[in-house]
């Protein structure tokens, strides 16, 4: 083989090698692009999963807060119901102590007894404690008659009862956290200052 042929052959071999290298490089670039697409796709999926996990955590936290809030409300309702029932049973005892106090004031000869003098103090202490727990007495004279808070004695003959005022409290009324436990029994008058 002569030098020209030899050179031609080398050039052809180099061209083939260059062509092969170009093909390999193109394949590598193509593979790299495909790999980059896969990586980007996986990164996107990871972001979506993280977002989903974050949303689930927020929903779970909100649900836990709602459960806690509902539980606290239910506990408050149970406690208030029990207190209300307790006060309903206690009110007749308070009435009895008030009646005893009235009787003590009527009869001077029993006022001197130390044990008898303690009854008004017991009553005052009892009313203070019950008020701290939400029991309120409805016993104000001079207020406009309110059928939600008051009941009249059966023989009251008033034509338009809502225009009358409370002149006398026969029996105190009670509310517990704005709920009426017992209406006050009252006498009425047309005059506010009675």
UniProtKB/Swiss-Prot annotation:
Biased composition (Polar residues): 18-29
InterPro entries: GrpE, GrpE_coiled_coil, GrpE_head
Subcellular location: Cytoplasm
Keywords, comma-separated and alphabetical: Chaperone, Cytoplasm, Stress response
Main location (coarse class): cytoplasm
Role this protein plays: Participates actively in the response to hyperosmotic and heat shock by preventing the aggregation of stress-denatured proteins, in association with DnaK and GrpE. It is the nucleotide exchange factor for DnaK and may function as a thermosensor. Unfolded proteins bind initially to DnaJ; upon interaction with the DnaJ-bound protein, DnaK hydrolyzes its bound ATP, resulting in the formation of a stable complex. GrpE releases ADP from DnaK; ATP binding to DnaK triggers the release of the substrate protein, thus completing the reaction cycle.
CDD domains, alphabetized: GrpE
Quaternary structure and partners: Homodimer.
SUPFAM superfamilies: Coiled-coil domain of nucleotide exchange factor GrpE (SSF58014), Head domain of nucleotide exchange factor GrpE (SSF51064)
Segments of this protein annotated with the region Disordered: 1-29
Sequence ranges of Basic and acidic residues compositional bias: 1-17
GO annotation, biological process: protein folding
Gene that specifies this protein: grpE2
Name by which UniProt lists this protein: Protein GrpE 2
One CC-aspect GO term: cytoplasm
Family (UniProt): Belongs to the GrpE family.
